Amino acid sequence: MPSMTSKVFAITGGASGIGAATCRLLAERGAAVICLADVSSTNFTSLQESIAKSNPSTLVHCTELDVRSADKVDQWLQSIVSTHGDLHGAANVAGIAQGAGLRATPTILEENDAEWSRILDVNLNGVFYSTRAQVRVMKDLPPGHRSIVNVASIAAFSHVPDVYAYGTSKSACAYLTTCIAADVFWSGIRVNCVSPGITNTPMLPQFEPKAKSLDEIKDMYRDQGYPTGEADGVARTIVWLLSEDSIPVYGANINVGACPP
C-alpha cells in the first residue's frame, strides 16, 4: 500500500464525490497536507472533521475556488507552495454534469450555446488552467517524484449523442492529458488520466433529471450493462497514480469501472 507520509497534495473539486474520496484516502495513507478547492464551501467543515478522525496528523486546507478563473487557480497553487514549500501531487477532479434524458432527434439541434460553453469552461478549461498552474510551480521545485492526475469519463468513449458538451469536454480532457504528459515527462512530472464509469456521486442524478430516484438510475444503467461503482474505487486509482508505486506510468488514461471496451 503506497504511503503518502510527509507529502503535499492539491485536489480540485475536493469537497464531494470522487474528490472528497480522494482526500480521505490520501489522509488514510499518511498525507501531510491536503489542499482542496471547490466552487462550493458547503461540505468543507464536515470533510475536515471526517479526515481529522481518520488521521489527525493530516493538515487540511479548504479554498473556495472556481476553476474557470485562470488567475485564481494560479494564485491558489502558488499559495500552496509558498505556505508548505512543496507540491508532490495534484488531482483535478472538478467538473459538472450535463442532463440527458429524452430529447428530440437530432439532439445536436437542442444543444444550448450557453450550456455548451459552461460545461467546456469547467470540464476542459478548468483542467487546462489547473494542470498548467501545477506544472508551473512543480518545475521550479527540487527534484523528486511529482504526479498530476486528471479526471475524464466513460463519456470520452461512449459517443452518447444527448450529452454532446459533456462527452466532448471529457474526450478533450483525456487528449490534453496525454499531450501534457509527453511535454513535461523530462521535467520529472508524470501526468495521467482516469475515466470513471457510472459512479455513485452527488453528480449522478444530474445526468438523468427525469429519473424519480437514484435506484431508478442505477437500474437503468445496469440494464445497459453499466453497473454503478463507488467513488472510493476511483479514488484508489487516483491515489495509486499519485504514488511512487506507479512511477513507470505516464500519459495513460485508465478506465475505472464498467466502460466500453
Swiss-Prot record:
Q: What organism is this sequence from? A: Claviceps purpurea (strain 20.1) (Ergot fungus)
Subunit record text: Homotetramer.
Which PANTHER family does the annotation name?
Answer: 3-OXOACYL-(ACYL-CARRIER-PROTEIN) REDUCTASE (AFU_ORTHOLOGUE AFUA_6G11210), DEHYDROGENASE_REDUCTASE FAMILY PROTEIN, PUTATIVE (AFU_ORTHOLOGUE AFUA_6G03520)-RELATED
Family from the record: Belongs to the short-chain dehydrogenases/reductases (SDR) family.
Q: Name one Pfam family in it.
A: adh_short_C2
Task: Name the domain of life this protein comes from.
Answer: Eukaryota
Q: Write out the catalysed reaction.
A: chanoclavine-I + NAD(+) = chanoclavine-I aldehyde + NADH + H(+)
Chain positions recorded as NADP(+) binding sites: I18, D66, R132, Y166, K170, T201
Please provide the record's keywords in A-Z order. Answer: Alkaloid metabolism, Glycoprotein, NADP, Oxidoreductase, Signal
One of the GO biological process terms: indole alkaloid biosynthetic process
> Under which pathway is this protein filed?
Alkaloid biosynthesis; ergot alkaloid biosynthesis
Q: What is its EC number?
A: 1.1.1.332
Glycan-modified residues: N43
GO molecular function list: oxidoreductase activity
Main EC class the enzyme belongs to: oxidoreductase
Q: What is this protein called?
A: Chanoclavine-I dehydrogenase easD
Encoded by which gene? easD
Q: Where is the signal peptide?
A: 1-20
| Keyword Glycoprotein among record annotations | yes
Active-site residue numbers = Y166 (proton donor), K170 (lowers pka of active site tyr)
Q: What does this protein do?
A: Chanoclavine-I dehydrogenase; part of the gene cluster that mediates the biosynthesis of fungal ergot alkaloid. DmaW catalyzes the first step of ergot alkaloid biosynthesis by condensing dimethylallyl diphosphate (DMAP) and tryptophan to form 4-dimethylallyl-L-tryptophan. The second step is catalyzed by the methyltransferase easF that methylates 4-dimethylallyl-L-tryptophan in the presence of S-adenosyl-L-methionine, resulting in the formation of 4-dimethylallyl-L-abrine.
